[in-house]
Amino acid sequence: MKTSLFKSLYFQVLTAIAIGILLGHFYPELGAQMKPLGDAFVKLIKMIIAPVIFCTVVTGIAGMESMKAVGRTGAVALLYFEVVSTIALIIGLIIVNVMQPGAGMNVDPSTLDAKAVAIYAEQAKDQGIVAFLLDVIPGSVIGAFASGNILQVLLFAVLFGFALHRLGSKGQLIFNVIESFSQVIFGIINMIMRLAPIGAFGAMAFTIGKYGVGTLIQLGQLIICFYITCILFVVVVLGSIARATGFNIFKFIRYIREELLIVLGTSSSESALPRMLDKMEKLGCRKSVVGLVIPTGYSFNLDGTSIYLTMAAVFIAQATNTHMDIFHQITLLVVLLLSSKGAAGVTGSGFIVLAATISAVGHLPIAGLALILGIDRFMSEARALTNLIGNGVATVVVAKWVKELDHKKLDDTLNNRVPDSKTQGLSS
């Protein structure tokens, strides 16, 4: 039985976003006051992310027959992440050089308000690769869960899963408890998701109310250029990868449309993480693969953020008439290959990584960040949407490469067919 249109989350979130835009535009002060609604929803999601990752990864790893399979999955995932995110960086670099959205602005860096970006520049000092790697190791297990640090929780979950697997039958009781706890957690997620329309409404009303449509027009060339690039990346690059893997990118986007709308409303791909874990498993990817690829992808496979970083950096150079020859752009690319891996899928993190990159390159004026500070919030939607689609595609690709993908289930689900339980099973 199909769900009524008015009861579907897709329709409710879309309607809430539209109402939020109207409120923010016609009553900006009231719209700006709706911010707590969006913040509250995102906090509710973050509250549940750590236990979701822990349960999914532990039960996935502990339930595998061979530990070699886990290592193979991790290696394949990291290889895929590196290749595709590098392609995203290069595409962003090429298109921003061709379209030149910042050309002709002739901005003097000394006239920009450096104080406006001082807080981001300060946070960027801690974005070194060594500091990033050390931060993956939690000071305490409780601290990792309390702070909601995805990679720290993931590391502990992987170790816990390995240890539980080695216990064999002795660990069966613990395995059953965690699996039951996982069902409770996903029950909580279903309750939280009923509030998604309210969260999307509040976040969108605040964005339009605070920054206004005028901000979009002021620096619209960069925004348009960025959105076009993200669309091209999803359709051409991810579309080609999907086709080579055996599925249609547009059918996949339709399958995760509710998650995309939640991300559109909150501007954070992290807000859809719990539901993506569940949906990718229902799509035919084995639980162990989903549990490793999705959480890891939130730091190592942010395609939208990669595009944003190269385009924003070169845009600042163009707008301030800072010459960037091929050597400077290659240096920028190399630095971004490292710094982009620390950009978690939360609102604002991409801007901090951009500040870190500009500081590391040294050739660009740090005050130039003030140029895009006001419109960064509007570009975060495209970043987050591209990140989410990219991680979903990555999960299917990795699952196929390690022969942990149910092809029939994938095909049936994307084509809205009810899978035949008698014929379900892994196929290579």
Swiss-Prot record:
Alphabetically ordered keywords of this record: Cell inner membrane, Cell membrane, Membrane, Symport, Transmembrane, Transmembrane helix, Transport
Domain of life: Bacteria
Chief site of localization: membrane
GO biological process terms held by the UniProt record: L-aspartate transmembrane transport
Localization per record: Cell inner membrane
Record field: transmembrane: 8-28, 44-64, 76-96, 142-162, 184-204, 222-242, 326-346, 352-372
Keyword Chloroplast among UniProt keywords: no
PROSITE patterns: NA_DICARBOXYL_SYMP_1, NA_DICARBOXYL_SYMP_2
SUPFAM superfamilies the record matches: Proton glutamate symport protein
Single Gene Ontology MF annotation: succinate transmembrane transporter activity
Pfam family name, one: SDF
GO CC terms in record: plasma membrane
Topological category with respect to the lipid bilayer: Multi-pass membrane protein
Function, in words: Responsible for the transport of dicarboxylates such as succinate, fumarate, and malate from the periplasm across the membrane.
Family named by the database record: Belongs to the dicarboxylate/amino acid:cation symporter (DAACS) (TC 2.A.23) family.
Name the UniProt record assigns to this protein: C4-dicarboxylate transport protein
Species annotation: Enterobacter sp. (strain 638)
